[in-house]
């Protein structure tokens, strides 16, 4: 069995985390629906759609097929979360809710950057 590169290991860990997010969305949709913007029709449907999006991105990264496209689409989805969920939540509510929204936004900014890095480097050969 060959040695796995640090880059590939990082991609696998990132994919597993995205897959877990997707599973959480599918199995906890009823508790996550509260963060879907009220002006967006469909409610719980969007929780399921994003869950499937996370899982499909994870699969693409794991099997290394269409990884660049999957990661860039994942980054766009996370940027949409920032603009439609986290930023509005930081503008209103009690101080603890605003602080939580800030933390979630920072987490998603980090995930966006990771998705861009994984996608950007997906077609480069692994080096040790």
Please state what every model-predicted region is.
Residues 1-27, 46-52, 56, 63-128:
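Extended, low-polarity transmembrane helix blocks
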Residues 9-10, 28-41:
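Short juxtamembrane and helix-loop transition motifs at transmembrane-helix boundaries
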């Amino acid at each position: 069995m060959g040695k796995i590169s640090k880059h590939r290991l990082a991609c696998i860990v990132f994919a597993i985390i995205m897959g877990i997010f997707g599973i959480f969305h599918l199995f906890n949709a009823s508790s996550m629906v509260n963060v879907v913007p009220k002006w967006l029709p469909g409610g719980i449907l969007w929780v399921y759609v994003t869950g499937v999006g996370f899982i499909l991105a994870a699969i693409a990264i794991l099997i290394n097929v269409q990884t660049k496209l999957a990661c860039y689409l994942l980054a766009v989805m996370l940027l949409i979360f920032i603009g439609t969920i986290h930023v509005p939540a930081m503008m209103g509510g009690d101080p603890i809710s605003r602080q939580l929204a800030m933390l979630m936004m920072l987490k998603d900014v980090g995930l966006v950057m990771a998705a861009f890095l994984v996608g950007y480097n997906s077609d480069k050969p692994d080096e040790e």
